[in-house]
């Protein structure tokens, strides 16, 4: 409830390098790019997520937005700190995404 949200350059750099405008994920898979504005709103996405999956020390939040969805992954370092790891967007319904299906299956 009173956990501290931490975001650092490593998480921002990872999200932009892997899922930003010039990333292979965007160029080759037609994934919508992540922007600095998206990253600045990640806490709102987490707070208003349609679904959140907790696995080991990872927390993965899914938010459906119009014709695409946003995924935010955080690491729970301890009971009171959540560190931004990455975020990405994909077209379609998050429940049909391979990432979601994998996380649900591994969570059982």
Question: Where on the chain are the PLM-derived regions?
Answer:
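Ribonuclease/tRNase effector modules and their secretory precursors
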Residues: 1-108
């Amino acid at each position: 409830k009173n956990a501290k949200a931490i975001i650092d350059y490593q998480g921002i750099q990872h999200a932009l390098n892997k899922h930003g405008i010039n990333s292979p994920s965007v160029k080759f898979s037609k994934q919508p790019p992540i922007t600095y504005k998206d990253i600045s709103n990640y806490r709102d996405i987490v707070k208003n997520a349609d679904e959140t999956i907790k696995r080991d020390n990872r927390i993965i939040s899914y938010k459906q937005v119009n014709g695409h969805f946003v995924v935010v992954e955080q690491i729970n370092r301890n009971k009171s700190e959540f560190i931004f790891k990455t975020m990405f967007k994909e077209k379609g319904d998050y429940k049909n995404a391979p990432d979601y299906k994998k996380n649900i299956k591994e969570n059982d």
